[in-house]
């Protein structure tokens, strides 16, 4: 499946919630009618079936983290094999992706931009270049901007925006050095309450 390259706001309107696909700290519902579906007339959404609700939640989370369908299913399979709550395991696996960690640290304005920074070899993990967005970051790994990339205006702009956002407690960032430490995996209480991972588990359990 190809990666979606169309308007980002359209995806958020389709899911009925801010997927944080656009840069900035202003809530997306101040920019567009989030309650209305995409399209000229922006028709209100009809009542979904149980399956439809589960599918929408899966699509919402998949798009939020910028993961393709096959990748997302594989993350679910890995989460199901781990001890503990499968839904929480799934979110932790997604949060541990390098592109997501780069975004959480504020080096990229969006996850898509952070993915690009990784792919363009602008990111170091423990001093070594890693250009795989799905690379699994471990506790106490140090993620930093490569020296020759530190003057990129988009990175500086992203850090300025990140200063206005709530800082994740599981990550420590030195904006001056453009480096951060992934202290631990986030607890469920650290993450968005707008995500209902139980619906995703129910969908894949059928």
Swiss-Prot record:
<keyword id="KW-0694">RNA-binding</keyword>
<protein>
    <recommendedName>
        <fullName>Small ribosomal subunit protein uS4</fullName>
    </recommendedName>
</protein>
<dbReference type="InterPro" id="IPR002942">
    <property type="entry name" value="S4_RNA-bd"/>
</dbReference>
<dbReference type="Pfam" id="PF00163">
    <property type="entry name" value="Ribosomal_S4"/>
</dbReference>
<dbReference type="GO" id="GO:0006412">
    <property type="term" value="P:translation"/>
</dbReference>
<comment type="function">
    <text>One of the primary rRNA binding proteins, it binds directly to 16S rRNA where it nucleates assembly of the body of the 30S subunit.</text>
</comment>
<keyword id="KW-0699">rRNA-binding</keyword>
<dbReference type="InterPro" id="IPR001912">
    <property type="entry name" value="Ribosomal_uS4_N"/>
</dbReference>
<dbReference type="Pfam" id="PF01479">
    <property type="entry name" value="S4"/>
</dbReference>
<dbReference type="InterPro" id="IPR005709">
    <property type="entry name" value="Ribosomal_uS4_bac-type"/>
</dbReference>
<comment type="subunit">
    <text>Part of the 30S ribosomal subunit. Contacts protein S5. The interaction surface between S4 and S5 is involved in control of translational fidelity.</text>
</comment>
<comment type="similarity">
    <text>Belongs to the universal ribosomal protein uS4 family.</text>
</comment>
<dbReference type="GO" id="GO:0019843">
    <property type="term" value="F:rRNA binding"/>
</dbReference>
<dbReference type="InterPro" id="IPR036986">
    <property type="entry name" value="S4_RNA-bd_sf"/>
</dbReference>
<comment type="function">
    <text>With S5 and S12 plays an important role in translational accuracy.</text>
</comment>
<dbReference type="GO" id="GO:0042274">
    <property type="term" value="P:ribosomal small subunit biogenesis"/>
</dbReference>
<dbReference type="GO" id="GO:0015935">
    <property type="term" value="C:small ribosomal subunit"/>
</dbReference>
<dbReference type="InterPro" id="IPR022801">
    <property type="entry name" value="Ribosomal_uS4"/>
</dbReference>
<keyword id="KW-0687">Ribonucleoprotein</keyword>
<feature type="domain" description="S4 RNA-binding">
    <location>
        <begin position="96"/>
        <end position="158"/>
    </location>
</feature>
<dbReference type="InterPro" id="IPR018079">
    <property type="entry name" value="Ribosomal_uS4_CS"/>
</dbReference>
<keyword id="KW-0689">Ribosomal protein</keyword>
<dbReference type="GO" id="GO:0003735">
    <property type="term" value="F:structural constituent of ribosome"/>
</dbReference>
